[in-house]
Structure formats: structure tokens, C-alpha cells
């Protein structure tokens, strides 16, 4: 038997079938580094339009988790796709370096008695070490960026830039010092930002407390009575007994109806709607003897239950019904609403009672409870209330309560003297910060769109921003306060620039070591030098100033506004939020044009990642076992706008999809063996109809993919590339061209036409996958035929694809119809194979009984229909002649009959043909193969 293998154009490529990503990816990273890929991208991007994605800095603490990986990969995919779209898309990664978590880590490691200077030194060293660890992990993900020169909020230039940003906001008239209740953590010993507050369940004591009337006549008058026949009291309900010693007022709603209830031994004031539930709670019988609106009770004095002072009634719209008594006890030092109401009624700061120290312990001088920790004082306070006859009822509840994000301990609101950026303070010129920010939100594009309403609601309802902290490791607030007036030095902005210049040379230590006389001269004794530091959200919130127009200038001619900020959805109250406020205060617009948010990672059942649940997926483990490209494909395959599921099973599915894409690319490469695009590429008009369709289909898909990339819809990109590989290519086109590729002449038009199509498709595909499968794309790039530069990323979307003319006879709709017929034939072939009626498809002969229109269409392929259907014979017959055993299909007007061929199998092409052995010199092969070996070769027109 003759071996005809040498006469075939068998596929061949050195591109490995097995990806071996964990081993190969580090080699590719090394290559990118050695050729200076990121630098080359900046070089070719010089004259391109710029796209600026500004990196929200992760905190310089700990190893990266899967959420970090998701975030960085999304950013990299966007920037790579923008580069391929013809933009200059730089990426400057950054780190958030100051703040309590690092200071806390240093204190835990070295103790709390280090001294401020040593603490800062150790914090800086710790942050530096953490950044190096995280940096190598991010690079391993295939993220291209300026890793040799990232921005760090602790770099001297950035610290100085932050001071300059603050100076701009001071100049704008937004900064003030005030006594206000702020989120306070006893363990931190400092105020916390809104973004540092978490809510967890807490068990608390609830109490109903009676405040006895101090002015009987006024209360009687308010209820339309001549006098009060019995002692009277107003009843409040609270979940914070520890605030009772600081009570200074009682709040009622001006429009609610309040009842005077006779309960036998006294009269109680309660909201009318709450009378029934309150009496049931107190186990009392009673009757309503009079009612009055809340506004009638204004300024009536009641007595504190155990201190000799008065508590007047103030009107407050925030009072609600539904729980409690309809009366809210008011401690202005420990509640934002309480504080606002008391200030509205003329209470000055010196009158506010604030007995809780920074560590959560009452001042020693507080009568009855001095020296006690507030959360342990609930019971002594309850006992005191019971002793004086003021306790109506007590119970325990489980409720959602604010906790420190770092220590997981309960917080309180505590009035302290702090520095604020005012939301409604009249600035030097223009609108208030709240008005500016709300307008800026309207001018910003949000992906997904619901982010706009979320951020709008937060800005509309937020209090003034407390920007000061009482910590060591932070950028200083370099203010001098007049000891007498409490006012800022008149040259504050000028002095801040002098300080910024020193910080730029020496770091924040320059301020802390500064002798005031160096700057103020003879004025120094008149001023206090402030030791507060800035909220870390101010650090990251001003990166648009100290990075984009500071340490790493980049942006557009219209100003350094970024095109995109991309972070997790929690950043609506974090980085997006603080950046919006500082941007509007400094520039009167948001520092970004578009906000994109992604959800959080969960396991496949929707549970959060937790070590206790043993469902944590570490990026390093994925890199070491599957490869970063599999992680990147998982990211691309998921709609990131909601929760993003990840597990070993989900990653395994991504690995399967990866193999399909890789194998498709490898098949095309292997069939490009011996193809030189410089000499073998055919013009479109010389290509076979099927090949022209394949290139046209690739072009249409490329347009769709470019649109999806532009909208950051990577899951659409992934699914369409995968489907293209599985269906149009793997399930149709690549199957059909195998015979032509392998059996026709090596330099025949039939083969070169297919190779031309494969070349065009491969050139397009390698670019499509480059933003997602960063490593694999560059590996594939090296094996493509023809001269090329060092990386796929140094190019733009492929422009060599051609469109089918509108009048092309075998156009798009035609091939869609043929594909449907092929699917129907394949389905019947599977049935026949399962029944052992035929072996392989090439043992089959198929007759298509079709209606006239379909017959005419299929007849256009002439005798090449069999190559499309991959059967040895394909015959057409009228639909009306279909025998009873012909099989109906899902294609209208088509029935099929498949039989096993009676003809011998060609040893070369494996088709069963009647002319096998006709040529005595080649008794084992068909006439077509004889012609391809020793004759002029077959001529194909369509497929």
C-alpha cells in the first residue's frame, strides 16, 4: 500500500498545544521588560489622542486578594483595548500610604511608646515594603504600567502636592474649624471618615425615661387645660443610655399630635400615635385627657432626671414615629441632628456638655459615673434612673450599629474641635460645594448608570467633611491659629506654600520638626502650630491634583481631568466621593469624565470570600496552577456590574474556554505553514467565495468587538470570540477547508485562498484577544507568518479585512442559509453514526430533498456542495420526491436521506468515490487526488 502522506499539505506549527501558562507567562513578562514594552507604547503614543485612566490607589498593606486582581485586570483590559484603538493610554499605578491601618500595624509590632518621629519612620519603611510585595503580584497579572515609577501618597512630592491642594481649597473659602459630632473610634483615638465606618449587629439596652415637668403652667396651657391635676413628665426612648448624662434638650416633631395621658399617679406626654404601644410596654392603664401639636410644646422646660438642669423642648423634623415614644432625647455632643437643632436654637459651643473623653471614658468630674467606660455604664445609668423614679421600661435589642472598619469595635458620634470642608459654606466665589458637586454628578457618565443616583443621594445628604485626624502618620494640616481669636494666620495660603516646598525636600517630617519662629518670626508666640493630620481620603481624593498635575503630569489640553475612574462600588462613598469634593472645590468640576464601578467577588453560591468558610481564592494560587490568562479570561467573562462569582469550578470552565480559543488559533497557525504573506496573499477578488465570506464575517465581528470594548462590555467580547471559535470557525469554516488545505496543490489558488483567509482571521483574532489574554496573544504573535514588530500591543486593530460587496452572489445571507443546512445534515449524520449505519461522515452519501428556492441556492455550489457538507456525495432532489423514510429538518422545505456509500474509500482524501482505482498507477486513490498529485490539480470556485 502506497503512503500518500508526503503528498498532503499536513498542518504543522511550533506553537505549543499545551499552554503551560504558569511556566510560560513569567518568561513573557521578562521579555516585555527586556524590550521595554511600556516605554515603546509611550513612544508610539506621542502623537495619538490621550486616554487617561487614573488609578485609584490600593492601600499599602498586605498581599493582594482576588478583588485587587479583578480591579487591576479590568483596568489593564481597558487600557490595552484603548491602545489598540489608536489612543495613547498610559497607566501610572499608585498606592495609598498614610493612615491608621499602617500606624496601627507599627504600634502592634513595636509598641505604642515609640514617639511620633520614630512612628513615622517605621510607617514609611513598612509601607515601602508592602508596596514592593503588591507590585510584583500586580505585574504577574500581566498589567502593563509605569511600575518603575508609580505614584505613592507618601512620596515627598505628593505630600507637598497634597498641602498645595489643601491651600487651594482654603483659598476657595471652603475650610473652617468647628465643634461638631464626628465618627469617633476609641481604639483609633481619632475621628473617622464616612468610608471607614461599617455597620454590624450590636446588642444594646433600650430605655424609656420620664423627664419631669419644670413649668406646669406652660404645659397645661399647651394642652388647653387650666392647670395640671397631677405631676407630669415627658417620656423619651433611646438605644444609647450612656448619652443621658449629656442630655440638654428634648425634640418633638412640630406637626405630630401629642397626647397628655393620665396613668393614675401622674400624667405622661407621648405622641398620640404611640400611646397604645407605650402603655402596653409600661404595663400601665391610662386615658388621653388632652392633645396638642408638637409646635405648641416648643421651649417648655422639663427637668433632667438626675442632674439639676433643664431640658427644653425643641422642634425637629427628623423625629419619627414607628418605635419609641415620638419624643427624642437630645445630646448635642453625641448626635449630628441633635447638634444641628441645638445650634439652631442658639446654643453656643461652650454650653455643649461633652463628658466623654477620647478613650470612651467619662471625665472623672462627671457626677455618679465619672471614670466609667461609656458602654459599661449602661447598667449604672439604668439603676440611677430606676432609683429616681424616671425609668419607665428597659429592654435589650439587636440592631445595626456603626463600627470601626479596622478594629471592628462600636463607634460613637463625639463632638470635637476639627477641621472641616463645608458642604454649604459660602465660598469665596461661586456656588457652595454641595451645589457644585451635584451639578458635576449630572455632567458625569456612570457605568452602570445606577451609580449616578447612588452618588447623588450621598452628596445630597452628607454632612460637612471632617478632614482632620489626631494621628502621627499622615500629611499635616500646616495651619497656625491665633491663640486669642482662634483665627487662621492671615498669610495662611502663602505659609502653606513655604511648608509645601520644605515637605517636597524633606517629607512630612519637615512640618513636625518645624519651629514656628522659622516662618512667623516675632509673631510665633501669638500662634499655635497645629499638629492634626489629614484624613487619608483627602490623600487619595486629591491625586487628581498632586499626581495628574504634580508627580506624573498627564491629561488633556482641556485640563488634567481623567477620562475614567474605575473602582469597586464601595468607592461611591470613598475615592469617587472624596475626589469629587476636592475636584469641585478646586476646579469647579469632577476630576473624571466617567465613573465605572464593579461589584465584589463571591463564591459560586453567592457567599462573600472568608477564610472561615474556606472559599477564598488567592490570585497567586491561580497564577501558579492555571496561569494569569485564565484569571483574565474569568474577569472578561463576567458581568462585573453586580457580584462576581469565582471558584475552582468557575475557573476550570474558564480554562476550558481558553483551550478552545487557543486550539482554534493553533489550528489556523498550523495551516499557515509554508505561507508567506508577502508573496502568497491573494487579493479579495481572487479568493474563493467561502473564504471571502469568512473574512467578511471576521470584519463584521471586529466591528462588534470594537464597540463592546469601547463600552467596557468584556463579557460580550469574550462570548462573541468564543462563539466565533466554536461555531463559525470550528463548527463550520475550519472543518470545510481541511480537505482543500490538505489535498490540493501546495501553491494552488484553492489552498492559498484559504490560507489568505486564515492569515487575515489570525491577524484579527490575535488583536481581539490581546486585551484579555495578554500573554497568549503575544505568544501567538511570535508564530504568525510575515515580518512583524515585537508585540501585538505595538499595533492597532487589524485593517486588512475586506467586506463582501452588496451585490456578491454568495453573500452573507446565502452562507447563513448554508450553515443552517449543514447543521441539519450534521444532526442526521450523528443519528446515523450512533445507529452504526455509517462510520465517519465521509462514508456517507446525503440526498437533500429541497423546495425549489432552496434547491436553486444549494445548486450554486455545484459539485462543491459535498465539500461544504463534508460527505462523499451530496445530491439535490425535489422536495416532492422525498421518500417516506426521509428525515424532516428544522430548515423549512428540507428533508434528508443519508446512506452509507457503496464506493471504495480513497486512501489519500478518505472520500468514498466511484473513481477510486480508475488510474492503474494509483489504484488506491480517487481521480481528484490523482489530478492533485500529478495533473494540473483540481479547481475550486466556491468552497
UniProtKB/Swiss-Prot annotation:
The short sequence motif called 'KMSKS' region sits at 608-612
Q: Which HAMAP family match?
A: Ile_tRNA_synth_type1
- Cofactor binding: number and manner: Binds 1 zinc ion per subunit.
Q: Which Gene3D superfamilies match?
A: 1.10.730.20, HUPs, Valyl/Leucyl/Isoleucyl-tRNA synthetase, editing domain
Can you supply one Gene Ontology CC term for this chain's record? cytosol
Gene name of the encoded protein: ileS1
Q: What name does the UniProt record give this protein? A: Isoleucine--tRNA ligase 1
Q: Where does ATP bind?
A: 611
Amino acid at each position: 500500500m502506497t503512503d500518500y502522506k508526503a503528498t498532503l499539505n499536513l498542518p504543522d506549527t511550533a506553537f505549543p498545544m499545551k499552554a503551560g501558562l504558569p511556566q510560560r507567562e513569567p518568561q513573557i513578562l521578562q521579555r516585555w521588560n527586556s524590550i521595554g514594552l511600556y516605554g515603546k507604547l509611550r513612544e508610539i503614543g506621542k502623537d495619538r489622542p490621550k486616554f487617561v485612566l487614573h488609578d485609584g490607589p490600593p492601600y499599602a498593606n498586605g498581599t493582594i486578594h482576588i478583588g485587587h486582581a479583578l480591579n487591576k485586570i479590568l483596568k489593564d483590559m481597558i487600557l490595552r483595548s484603548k491602545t489598540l484603538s489608536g489612543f495613547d493610554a498610559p497607566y501610572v499605578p499608585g498606592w495609598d500610604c498614610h493612615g491608621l491601618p499602617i500606624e496601627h500595624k507599627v504600634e502592634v509590632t513595636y509598641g505604642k511608646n515609640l514617639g511620633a518621629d520614630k512612628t513615622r519612620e517605621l510607617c514609611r519603611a513598612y509601607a515601602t515594603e508592602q508596596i514592593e510585595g503588591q507590585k510584583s503580584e500586580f505585574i504577574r497579572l500581566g498589567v502593563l504600567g509605569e511600575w518603575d515609577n508609580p505614584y505613592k501618597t507618601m512620596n515627598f512630592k505628593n505630600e507637598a502636592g497634597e498641602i498645595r491642594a489643601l491651600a487651594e481649597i482654603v483659598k476657595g473659602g471652603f475650610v473652617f474649624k468647628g465643634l461638631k459630632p464626628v465618627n469617633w473610634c476609641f481604639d483609633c483615638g481619632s475621628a473617622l471618615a464616612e468610608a471607614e465606618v461599617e455597620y454590624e449587629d450590636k446588642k444594646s439596652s433600650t430605655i424609656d425615661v420620664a423627664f419631669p415637668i419644670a413649668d406646669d403652667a406652660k404645659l397645661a396651657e399647651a394642652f388647653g387645660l387650666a392647670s395640671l391635676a397631677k405631676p407630669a413628665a415627658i417620656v423619651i426612648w433611646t438605644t444609647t443610655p450612656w448619652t443621658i448624662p449629656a442630655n440638654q434638650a428634648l425634640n418633638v416633631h412640630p406637626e405630630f399630635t401629642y397626647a397628655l395621658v393620665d396613668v393614675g399617679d401622674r400624667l405622661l406626654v407621648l405622641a398620640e400615635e404611640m400611646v397604645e404601644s407605650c402603655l402596653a410596654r409600661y404595663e400601665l392603664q391610662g386615658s388621653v385627657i388632652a392633645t396638642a401639636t408638637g409646635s405648641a410644646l416648643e421651649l417648655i422646660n422639663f427637668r433632667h432626671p438626675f442632674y439639676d438642669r433643664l431640658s427644653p423642648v425643641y422642634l425637629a423634623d427628623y423625629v419619627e414615629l414607628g418605635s419609641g415614644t415620638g419624643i427624642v432625647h437630645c445630646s448635642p455632643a453625641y448626635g449630628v441632628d441633635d447638634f444641628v437643632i441645638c445650634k439652631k436654637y442658639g446654643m453656643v459651643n461652650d454650653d455643649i456638655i461633652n463628658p466623654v473623653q477620647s478613650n470612651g471614658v467619662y471625665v472623672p468630674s462627671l457626677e455618679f459615673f465619672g471614670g466609667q467606660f461609656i458602654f459599661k455604664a449602661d447598667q449604672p445609668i439604668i439603676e440611677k434612673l430606676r432609683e429616681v423614679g424616671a425609668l419607665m421600661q428597659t429592654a435589650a435589642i439587636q440592631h445595626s450599629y456603626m463600627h470601626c472598619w479596622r478594629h471592628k469595635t462600636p463607634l460613637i458620634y463625639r463632638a470635637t474641635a476639627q477641621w472641616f470642608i463645608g458642604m454649604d459654606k459660602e465660598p469665596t466665589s461661586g456656588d457652595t460645594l454641595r451645589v457644585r458637586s451635584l451639578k458635576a454628578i449630572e455632567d458625569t457618565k456612570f457605568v452602570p448608570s445606577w451609580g449616578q443616583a447612588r452618588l447623588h443621594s450621598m452628596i445630597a445628604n452628607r454632612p460637612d467633611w471632617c478632614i482632620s485626624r489626631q494621628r502621627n502618620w499622615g500629611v499635616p494640616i500646616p495651619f497656625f491659629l491665633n491663640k486669642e481669636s482662634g483665627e487662621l494666620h492671615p498669610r495662611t495660603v502663602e505659609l502653606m506654600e513655604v511648608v509645601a516646598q520644605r515637605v517636597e525636600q524633606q517629607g512630612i517630617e519637615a512640618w513636625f520638626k518645624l519651629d514656628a519662629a522659622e516662618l512667623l518670626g516675632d509673631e510665633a508666640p501669638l500662634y499655635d502650630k497645629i499638629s492634626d493630620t489629614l484624613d487619608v481620603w483627602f490623600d487619595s481624593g486629591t491625586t487628581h491634583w498632586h499626581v495628574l498635575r504634580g508627580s506624573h503630569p498627564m491629561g488633556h489640553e482641556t485640563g488634567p481631568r481623567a477620562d475614567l475612574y474605575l473602582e469597586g462600588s464601595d468607592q461611591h462613598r470613598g475615592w469617587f466621593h472624596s475626589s469629587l469634593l476636592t475636584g469641585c472645590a478646586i476646579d469647579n468640576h469632577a476630576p473624571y469624565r466617567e465613573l465605572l464601578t464593579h461589584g465584589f467577588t463571591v463564591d459560586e453560591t453567592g457567599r462573600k470570600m472568608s477564610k472561615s468558610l474556606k472559599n477564598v481564592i488567592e490570585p497567586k494560587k491561580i497564577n501558579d496552577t492555571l496561569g494569569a490568562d485564565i484569571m483574565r479570561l474569568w474577569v472578561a467573562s463576567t458581568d462585573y456590574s453586580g457580584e462576581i462569582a469565582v471558584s475552582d469550578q468557575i475557573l476550570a470552565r474558564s480554562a476550558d474556554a481558553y483551550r478552545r480559543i487557543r486550539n482554534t488559533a493553533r489550528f489556523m497557525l498550523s495551516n499557515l505553514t509554508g505561507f508567506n504573506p508577502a508573496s502568497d496573499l491573494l487579493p479579495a477578488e481572487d479568493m474563493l467565495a467561502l473564504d471571502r465570506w469568512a473574512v467578511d464575517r471576521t470584519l463584521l465581528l471586529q466591528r462588534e468587538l470594537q464597540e463592546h470594548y469601547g463600552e467596557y462590555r468584556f463579557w460580550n467580547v469574550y462570548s462573541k470570540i468564543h462563539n466565533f471559535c466554536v461555531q463559525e470557525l470550528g463548527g463550520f469554516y475550519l472543518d470545510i477547508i481541511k480537505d482543500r488545505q490538505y489535498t490540493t496543490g501546495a501553491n494552488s489558488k484553492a489552498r492559498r485562498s484559504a490560507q489568505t483567509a486564515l492569515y487575515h482571521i489570525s491577524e484579527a483574532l490575535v488583536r481581539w484577544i490581546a486585551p484579555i489574554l495578554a500573554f497568549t496573544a503575544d505568544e501567538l504573535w511570535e508564530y504568525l507568518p510575515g515580518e512583524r514588530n515585537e508585540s501585538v500591543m505595538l499595533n492597532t486593530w487589524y485593517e486588512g479585512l475586506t467586506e463582501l460587496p452588496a451585490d456578491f452572489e454568495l453573500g452573507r445571507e446565502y452562507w447563513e442559509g448554508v450553515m443552517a443546512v449543514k447543521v441539519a445534515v450534521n444532526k442526521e449524520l450523528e443519528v446515523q453514526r450512533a445507529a452504526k449505519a455509517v462510520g465517519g461522515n465521509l462514508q456517507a452519501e446525503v440526498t437533500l430533498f429541497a423546495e425549489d428556492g432552496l434547491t436553486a441556492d444549494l445548486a450554486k455550489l455545484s459539485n462543491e456542495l459535498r465539500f461544504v457538507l463534508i460527505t462523499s456525495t451530496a445530491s439535490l432532489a425535489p422536495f416532492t420526491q422525498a421518500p417516506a423514510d426521509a428525515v424532516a429538518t428544522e430548515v423549512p422545505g428540507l428533508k434528508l436521506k443519508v446512506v452509507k456509500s457503496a464506493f471504495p474509500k480513497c486512501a489519500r482524501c478518505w472520500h468514498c468515490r466511484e473513481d477510486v482505482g480508475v488510474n492503474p498507477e494509483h489504484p488506491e486513490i480517487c481521480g481528484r487526488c490523482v489530478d492533485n498529485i500529478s495533473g494540473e490539480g483540481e479547481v475550486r470556485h466556491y468552497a
